Amino acid sequence: MASIMEGPLSKWTNVMKGWQYRWFVLDYNAGLLSYYTSKDKMMRGSRRGCVRLRGAVIGIDDEDDSTFTITVDQKTFHFQARDADEREKWIHALEETILRHTLQLQGLDSGFVPSVQDFDKKLTEADAYLQILIEQLKLFDDKLQNCKEDEQRKKIETLKETTNSMVESIKHCIVLLQIAKDQSNAEKHADGMISTINPVDAIYQPSPLEPVISTMPSQTVLPPEPVQLCKSEQRPSSLPVGPVLATLGHHQTPTPNSTGSGHSPPSSSLTSPSHVNLSPNTVPEFSYSSSEDEFYDADEFHQSGSSPKRLIDSSGSASVLTHSSSGNSLKRPDTTESLNSSLSNGTSDADLFDSHDDRDDDAEAGSVEEHKSVIMHLLSQVRLGMDLTKVVLPTFILERRSLLEMYADFFAHPDLFVSISDQKDPKDRMVQVVKWYLSAFHAGRKGSVAKKPYNPILGEIFQCHWTLPNDTEENTELVSEGPVPWVSKNSVTFVAEQVSHHPPISAFYAECFNKKIQFNAHIWTKSKFLGMSIGVHNIGQGCVSCLDYDEHYILTFPNGYGRSILTVPWVELGGECNINCSKTGYSANIIFHTKPFYGGKKHRITAEIFSPNDKKSFCSIEGEWNGVMYAKYATGENTVFVDTKKLPIIKKKVRKLEDQNEYESRSLWKDVTFNLKIRDIDAATEAKHRLEERQRAEARERKEKEIQWETRLFHEDGECWVYDEPLLKRLGAAKH
């Protein structure tokens, strides 16, 4: 008899363009979520539709505590629970079901417990098979030279291209497994335990469902015997390159709590009713709805240009085939040597990339699709709601610059920033602060594909400056005591430091001496896995200070979200932000709207600017933060507030590598950046690993010697990080 969880949920339907009540039945043994228009219809067996859970992915909205999604069979189904607790119950039960059936899908049903030695042996064997395959691949060229028929030539070329794609996937898999093995060994020596993200020789011990499903009959509990991670009789080349995604829910963390909408009737419960008879034989090959009224994201796969094809073999197992480009080859990994070896090349060709960060680069749009199998493997090791701060991400998804340098792009329009102090009226200064703030985000995105900047090393510094458009060569007096002492007093200067590693906190400061304006901020980035998305909470605040008026504008930052991480990733901002000036009483509320799944536009913002003690705003703003924003004033005037498409981006200026200190961002990451530029992923990974190992070694040394880390340019002041020598302090000292 099937063991079942049943209860009400709301489901989004395209027909009604809204939420509709449905009665859901989760069959744990069959791996099927069926739904009915009512409980009575369920009693009569009149099923409205069903969702297959084998290979499914659960997603949550970080800003809504009641909704969740299930993505499977190239469709995304949207559900809404009564509240956060109800959603938690369903998600946990669904995760357990998905995990169970995904393990079955992978054929991991043996009691063999692998060791690191077994793993290393299979890895070496896999590398040997890979070498044989590479040698055989060369024969295609001989075939093509001897082939005279066009039709036969096309067939050989197609076969060669497909084989190339497979070889590249296997290369990525071997590299990732080697890294996992090395990190697992290092962490076992350091901590006496194995990292969650790298379970090389760990044994997954499934746990019974949490209290909500504690009443489930005993036959539904996953078998207690250890689960084999790699069947010994399988040849390495037959191992799955990209395992079907599964969110591990055996250590479930609470999902985000935020205001949700909609309703859901009484709580779900677990029963084992006799009136429901769902055997595994009744599980359809694809999820379906009788009226096909379910909402699904049609662009979930088509954006990548190569939709995954799901094949069902005679045994009922599923696999995902993806197309990948073979144009960017990797060096063959050597499994007999550690990836910690030093780079033989590196800095001699530094001029090739010294200024590349100042250019947009869309040439890598295909790299995410190319490495999709590695991303799928990585995501299969993390669980929903998991904090990703300590997760080591694959090198190829990195953007070629540090996070500290990305923060510098807040000042890509330095003329807007310094013009704040030019305004004579406090009302106009507040409007100008909002204008600069809303213009500050679009320049931070380089290229059409979202990538992740480097995690800064503790103590890392980034320095740069901007020359204002109206600056003349006569303004040559240097700001010798400023953050960038080799530039003129009319320039906007910027400095950033990674002041903490755990938690990751960056502090940055900017100023313009002649305009008597400065900016100080700190941001703690906290990332979270949301299923098909990754959310980054930017915790912290900034302060714009107009020194001539003794005004300080406190502002907060929106959260960032990486969407469609399995196809073509894109970034959106979300959350409510505020700007307040305590001296003048002016304030602004700004909302970055995330795209709703049931329609709507991307990148929308709305903002209201208020006068002191007024509840009604004198200026309303709406538009897109990376496009055009329009302002409507209480006087009836309508105008373009900011047009980021027409605003010229002023390039930041950075010292050449040979002039930088060792701990400056571009100098620290030069080997990683260079190898990413030439697409040598192995060498980039080695260089990145050396930096991380050096940081760990320094941390161990400080711990052994009981030495506290001392920051270079910033100090902690309450809950904020403040620049040691701000313009305000220097001007005050000069008066005395």
UniProtKB/Swiss-Prot annotation:
Chemical reaction(s) catalysed: a 1,2-diacyl-sn-glycero-3-phospho-(1D-myo-inositol 4-phosphate)(out) + a 1,2-diacyl-sn-glycero-3-phospho-L-serine(in) = a 1,2-diacyl-sn-glycero-3-phospho-(1D-myo-inositol 4-phosphate)(in) + a 1,2-diacyl-sn-glycero-3-phospho-L-serine(out)
Keyword Acetylation: yes
Gene Ontology molecular-function annotations: sterol binding; sterol transfer activity
Known role: Interacts with OSBPL11 to function as lipid transfer proteins. Together they form a heterodimer that localizes at the ER-trans-Golgi membrane contact sites, and exchanges phosphatidylserine (1,2-diacyl-sn-glycero-3-phospho-L-serine, PS) for phosphatidylinositol-4-phosphate (1,2-diacyl-sn-glycero-3-phospho-(1D-myo-inositol 4-phosphate), PI(4)P) between the two organelles, a step that is critical for sphingomyelin synthesis in the Golgi complex.
Gene (UniProt): OSBPL9
Subunit and interaction comment: Heterodimer with OSBPL11. Interacts with OSBPL10.
Residues carrying N-acetylalanine: 2
Organism of derivation: Homo sapiens
Chain intervals with Low complexity compositional bias: 253-290
Main localization of the protein described in the UniProt heading: membrane
Keywords: Acetylation, Endosome, Golgi apparatus, Lipid transport, Lipid-binding, Membrane, Phosphoprotein, Transport
Gene Ontology terms describing biological process: bile acid biosynthetic process
Residues carrying Phosphoserine: 306, 324-326, 329, 611
Region described as Disordered: 231-367
UniProt domain PH: residue ranges: 2-99
Family recorded in the similarity comment: Belongs to the OSBP family.
Biased composition, class Polar residues, residue ranges: 314-329, 336-347
SMART domains: PH (SM00233)
Record bears the keyword Lipid biosynthesis: no
Protein name: Oxysterol-binding protein-related protein 9
GO cellular component: cytosol; Golgi apparatus; intracellular membrane-bounded organelle; late endosome membrane; membrane
Tissues and organs where the protein is expressed, per its UniProt entry: Widely expressed.
Location(s), subcellular: Late endosome membrane; Golgi apparatus, trans-Golgi network membrane
